[in-house]
Amino acid sequence: MFKKRLPTKRVVIAGCRNYNNYEYAKIYIDLCLSNIRKENNIVVVSGCASGADAIGERYAKENGFKVEKYPADWNVYGKSAGPIRNKQMAEICDYVICFWDGKSKGTKSMIYYAKEYNKTIKIKMI
């Protein structure tokens, strides 16, 4: 008959631009999403940066998830573009998965805004 319509959950996958261990990240993302993907449509939210953001986009593609892109507008906002983008992503998402080296200011900003908006956040130190 009719297929049950699943709710949508938006998941930011972000982190350091120099992080490129897809196989390791995939295992961690699978673990983080194991419960919510059963009863929800997943949308991966991407900041369109290299590294962890690109890993998130690849993961979405391989798993048949939609991707919503939030590129930073460096030409308009200059150095503020990254934090502005991170705030936007934190506002609209349900979950955040970050791959962080403990130093990246951009990832720290994403974590900050996720906490400000009381989002469920998983941080994998790399």
Annotate each predicted stretch with a short phrase.
Residues 2-11, 18-126:
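Acidic/glycine-enriched connector segments
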